[in-house]
Amino acid sequence: MNWNEKPKSATLPPLYPKSQPPFLHQSLINQITTTSQSSFSYPGSNQEACMYPGNSNPISQPLLNIQNYPQQISVSDMHNGTVVASHTSVERITYANVNGPKQLTHNLQMSSGVTQNVWLNSPMRNPVHSHIGATVSHQTDFGANVPNMPALQSQLITSDTYSMQMQMIPSNSTRLPVAYQGNQGLNQSFSEQQVDWTQQCISKGLTYPDYRPPPKLYRYSPQSFLPDSTIQKQNFIPHTSLQVKNSQLLNSVLTLPSRQTSAVPSQQYATQTDKRPPPPPYNCRYGSQPLQSTQHITKHLSMEVPQSREMLSSEIRTSFQQQWQNPNENVSTIGNFTNLKVNTNSKQPFNSPIRSSVDGVQTLAQTNEEKIMDSCNPTSNQVLDTSVAKEKLVRDIKTLVEIKQKFSELARKIKINKDLLMAAGCIKMTNTSYSEPAQNSKLSLKQTAKIQSGPQITPVMPENAERQTPTVVESAETNKTQCMLNSDIQEVNCRRFNQVDSVLPNPVYSEKRPMPDSSHDVKVLTSKTSAVEMTQAVLNTQLSSENVTKVEQNSPAVCETISVPKSMSTEEYKSKIQNENMLLLALLSQARKTQKTVLKDANQTIQDSKPDSCEMNPNTQMTGNQLNLKNMETPSTSNVSGRVLDNSFCSGQESSTKGMPAKSDSSCSMEVLATCLSLWKKQPSDTAKEKECDKLRTNTTAVGISKPANIHVKSPCSVVGNSNSQNKISNPSQQTALSMVMHNYESSGINITKGTELQIAVVSPLVLSEVKTLSVKGITPAVLPETVYPVIKEGSVCSLQNQLAENAKATAALKVDVSGPVASTATSTKIFPLTQKEKQNESTNGNSEVTPNVNQGKHNKLESAIHSPMNDQQISQESRNSTVVSSDTLQIDNICSLVEGDTSYNSQIAKIFSSLPLKMVEPQKPSLPNQQGIGSREPEKQLDNTTENKDFGFQKDKPVQCTDVSHKICDQSKSEPPLESSFNNLETNRVILEKSSLEHATEKSTANDTCSSAAIQEDIYPQEIDASSNYTPQDPARNEIHSDKAPVLYLHDQLSELLKEFPYGIEAVNTREGSVGQQTTYQTSEDQTADKTSSDSKDPADQIQITILSSEQMKEIFPEQDDQPYVVDKLAEPQKEEPITEVVSQCDLQAPAAGQSRDSVILDSEKDDIHCCALGWLSMVYEGVPQCQCNSIKNSSSEEEKQKEQCSPLDTNSCKQGERTSDRDVTVVQFKSLVNNPKTPPDGKSHFPELQDDSRKDTPKTKHKSLPRTEQELVAGQFSSKCDKLNPLQNHKRKKLRFHEVTFHSSNKMTASYEQASQETRQKKHVTQNSRPLKTKTAFLPNKDVYKKHSSLGQSLSPEKIKLKLKSVSFKQKRKLDQGNVLDMEVKKKKHDKQEQKGSVGATFKLGDSLSNPNERAIVKEKMVSNTKSVDTKASSSKFSRILTPKEYLQRQKHKEALSNKASKKICVKNVPCDSEHMRPSKLAVQVESCGKSNEKHSSGVQTSKESLNGLTSHGKNLKIHHSQESKTYNILRNVKEKVGGKQPDKIWIDKTKLDKLTNISNEAQFSQMPPQVKDQKKLYLNRVGFKCTERESISLTKLESSPRKLHKDKRQENKHKTFLPVKGNTEKSNMLEFKLCPDILLKNTNSVEERKDVKPHPRKEQAPLQVSGIKSTKEDWLKFVATKKRTQKDSQERDNVNSRLSKRSFSADGFEMLQNPVKDSKEMFQTYKQMYLEKRSRSLGSSPVK
């Protein structure tokens, strides 16, 4: 079982042993438990048990055991280890093995190339199919489960195959021989490789990017991933089938891990590619692959009719071996051969024809020479031939596009049929649920149903979604290929199908059970016929009559064969047969519903692993495949049969859900299936589910919540008590099971580890997200689904979320799916990547849990799911922590994968983080009593409801409970940031969607929320803390909180890395989405404590991680910083914490934690303010850590908050006007509102408008008052700038509103006005310091503090900011004057004008769009407008020069940059445009100054800006989210640049910029965050907590660049010039993720920061070489670079320390006069160093990512 444990397929293998010991154990245990499986799996030939152990690949031996081929077993041990249940496969493999399977394998490898798909390791792949014969037979019902483990990996492979088809094809060739050679060794190594490869893919972004590259390869499929689930699912269905094959290949890979890992993926890919584009390649390949499907069936038949098959297997084996001996003949006669075999064995003919087909396929695969059906030859050869494989891929893509179109037509037809069925009555809600999802999820439903019927990816719940779909698509494509291969393979396949339908019309589904020989034959056929024919039915609703006839024949066969759902299955299938398209709808609905039930069972199976899995393989194979087909067409006919057949919906679901719930309850595979299906189903099903939970609550409750929910209205208590406890375990357990299934990678150790990550790349995180949300959320499902839809509409995970958007349209249709937490988990999980993902999570959980509420088992179920399921799902609950973390990890991994597809990926990433906060809050609440689950999800639902103003009154209190519970919990247990993240996300969505509505709702429920929230918080508080702590791992930030926890560690590592890589994409997504949550995500990166502010998408991960690492560690390390950070927090808090202050009394812990957490994070970068607030926040999150000065801030902010609240009339307007401006403000204020005010859902908006109102109010009111206006500008400008950056949509409105008022001079104002605000606010209130840590300030203050700390001015600034104010005023004015009016007047005016011009332009993204010359023109245009404003800002900032601490730092940097720009305008210009784009809002002052310094370089900077705008487009969100950090980074970069003096070309400069950003940002931010006293501690902190601190910051940075990991490779070239912050983020991400550069950078940064303190230029120069190497180089380069670094540092230190250090020191103190010479020196030295480094880099890193 070692292999199982390693790939963590052990969970699935236990699943399979559970349900189908003979078959699933054969396939799974063969696959997973090699020796154990042999004796267990194949009772038919126990002799092979010995052989099986003797057989290095016991996988094939059980089949051989069944086949009684001990001799061949040993011969085909290796292959037959893979050919677990494949007589044919065993024969072939035996033959191949006997005949030299390695030879054949290599022949297949080389000759087959792509025929690897066609069974390049025809023996191996037959074994895989043989294994998948059992697996596919079980994958026909639970075959998905078996393939799910391997198929998940295969899905990874498959996904990889999409993008890496060419890659994987060679890998297949390479790994095929290895697989064949080292079956045993590879067996374990395969699991390792699978896991590693999966992780590889995940880390490489292959998980989803590979899946996303298929959009490139199969553009329609991934793009259709959501909308065209059918094709993508078809792609995945072929994947699943192939993955089922690959599962057996994985079994082979168990035997042949290296080959199987790559080869199976490649085979899978090729085969899937063939099957995916069945028409061109599948014609030939389909000959192979349908035959492979036949091999599936044949092997399944072999496995399932072990003894009677044994003889036939022997005969067929002999004949096939003969045919193998004559592969060319077989290849030419594959169709005939299959027909021959089919004719030879009528029942067995299917085994034999299938085997013949399999053998023929293998023959074809091996001998592609003649005609691998014309396409098969190229295909198999193309597996190795990359060019041919590419051509094949092109063909396949075209075929898939055709399939997509056909599926779209089918979806339309099915939708129409569903609508008709919905009109018919029972299907109304279900059909509504599926009508839209049918189009979007129709294919996925079909494919999922087919996946479950054919491949039955039941166990892999996450994988099921994608992987089942691939299997179904594979089947569909195989079926289509069969249809396309009508002359060849469809004759065979259709003959096979016809014979299967005629000969085994019942066995087709009978085979879904480990039944008699025909049953096994049919099972094999069903895995193929179900997969293929169901796919035919799905693929061809047009062909649905024929296919449905086949499926109908299969339906009766299922009825016959399936013992439990047999009669009902017959009825259902008869009903479905009556409705062929309805059958397809039923397939879709069943796919969704049965998959929900099967996923429940699969979850249970995963939870109950082996018994349930095996049970579910018989049950969910019978009942799983039948419930997949039947329960997928029966409960899913309850769902879709609700659509398809009311009778079938009721009786079918009752019978299916009765038969199935017993099995569903007994095995979670149905849940897993259902969850996977739900994943692939549209998340709008949440709304549909809500309605169906209301409407079909008795019927559909089980359908949605527990897949057999119609029967389980009581069964939702039983199936939702069992299945819904399991569905709550589908929420918790399905969360855990989904988590387990999806994340059992880490937790349960299922093979789905890889496939899930890859396949459910988008879905899986969402599933986890939603499952997390689902567990607690059932209170207000009705309202949320609608809100969920906007989320769906916002941005889909690739096509998935587009599908979800369509599903949002098909709210009613999706309501059935929404009924099930599995579906809602899967569905809303999919949706949750969107900003409303949390809403959707709420909605999904609400729907899912509304059904439990209807079932009245929601909380009981939650508790039983959380507690009772903890028995089965105690691991699942841990899985939920670790698995949810896994979920997050998967999410992030998936998102990381998606990150490559940044565009379609971004929105979802943002919303994954949105849902992650909710996840964090919701899982917290699942731990909490029902109150909290209701309260926590309900508030978010209320946010949605508030948006809708639906159940506002009902949810008014609960949102309060939930909100403040979440806040309080968040405050105490870091639940607050996640919840606030969720709320911010929800609020962002809500603000975006229904700002005024939410404002009204906010105002309505503010008092109630405040009161009941405070009360409930305290009630739920401890539990929520526990839930928060328990659930923390689920959130990336929570992961960081629990990063020290063992379960979380692995996931946390992945999540941390992924978050580092992933949030980047989130930012880009958010910016593009223009959603508040995304903007808040930006601020989370910027204001690491602003995570509450920006807790939208990134907060949960960024904010929590940052807070944990920053606040907690700073608590530990910098407790002293509490006061000072608090003072700084006060600066920012006049605006931000004013709303907090009101709520602070109620949420004192929350308010300091929330308000100051963000501010103190800002101040943490600036000062140690983050520690005060973060300390308070951490105190609240973790323990009663003193609130630092949050109470003072609260007191002072209470007044302002009250004032702002008094401005509530303006709130709505300002929320409307300034909400976009206030997106950042909302981020800033909203978290505080969320954290502080129990009226978070409303108050978040209330305070958001209030803050904005305050700032807007102050803008007209105190516009002439420098502080109010400055503060106002700080709030508006910072947030405006950031929001403008973040939300182009909102920015345009906001731009006009605020950019002219406060926006981009607000960046300089933020530097100037910010400082003014800081001064005045400090003078007025000590709260003003909170204003300083405003998001923009976060970047500036840390840098400025570091800078000032480095400079004499900054030394007193950090410790005492009041002193610093005065000193900063005088000193900075001095310095401004010293630096010349260039900085104070010229630079300020000039660059401020430029900055405002840029800001206005950049805010409107004119700068991004016309950054180059138009940007300059726009800047000239804006000069008048922004000049006036900048004059005001300058007046304010001149008035309060003291507050120039941030600005002084910026100016200092600008001055240095001006000098360095003068020295090297190119580099500086590039920095400036990057700043304009990346840090445009927050770095605008820096930008403006540097731009003002060099207008010339603006043109070159324009190019860079264009580049960085290109990067911004892809990284725009990433870049924009990190305005503060970008400001930090940019300031650091500027300092570095100034120190470098522009010597370094852009590349090196960018490398330096990246590393300097990293080091400067992390160091400066960290050091800035600490007072000078703490700086030494900070150094210790860096050393001690450097990793975590960097993680914390890296998480911010990670959020900057989680997506850009690849982006920072691909776009690093751009970004090094274009996006300094993304570069920085990439650098830090690289440090954290890619190269583990964080520790090096942090340590280096510590030194650099120390030097920088003393000598700004030197540390930066020093850092620049350090970072240049580090960023550009990999770990090696860092290792190699140590010497180079030392050299360069020595040179830099010798030169720059003497020149730049002294001159820059004097420049820091005296002005930029001294800076120019050092800059020149540093420029020269840096040029020298650049050349040196470039040479070194070219040597060490010929392909450096930076270049």
UniProtKB/Swiss-Prot annotation:
Official protein name in the record: Retroelement silencing factor 1
Region (Disordered): 261-280, 833-856, 923-956, 1073-1101, 1200-1274, 1686-1716
Keywords: Isopeptide bond, Nucleus, Phosphoprotein, Ubl conjugation
GO biological process: transposable element silencing by heterochromatin formation
Polar residues composition bias: residue spans: 261-272, 842-856, 1073-1087
Oligomer and partners: Interacts with SETDB1.
Organism: Homo sapiens
Residue stretches of biased makeup (Basic and acidic residues): 937-956, 1089-1101, 1217-1226, 1242-1261, 1689-1698
Coarse class of the protein's main subcellular location: nucleus
Task of the protein: Plays a role in the regulation of imprinted gene expression, regulates repressive epigenetic modifications associated with SETDB1. Required for the recruitment or accumulation of SETDB1 to the endogenous retroviruses (ERVs) and maintenance of repressive chromatin configuration, contributing to a subset of the SETDB1-dependent ERV silencing in embryonic stem cells.
Subcellular localization(s) per the UniProt record: Nucleus
Pfam families in alphabetical order: DUF4617
Residue(s) of cross-link: Glycyl lysine isopeptide (Lys-Gly) (interchain with G-Cter in SUMO2): 216, 707, 1136, 1528, 1636, 1723
Residues carrying Phosphoserine: 221, 1145, 1358, 1708, 1740
GO cellular component, one term: nucleus
GO molecular function (one): histone binding
Sequence positions bearing Phosphothreonine: 1240
Designated gene of the protein: RESF1
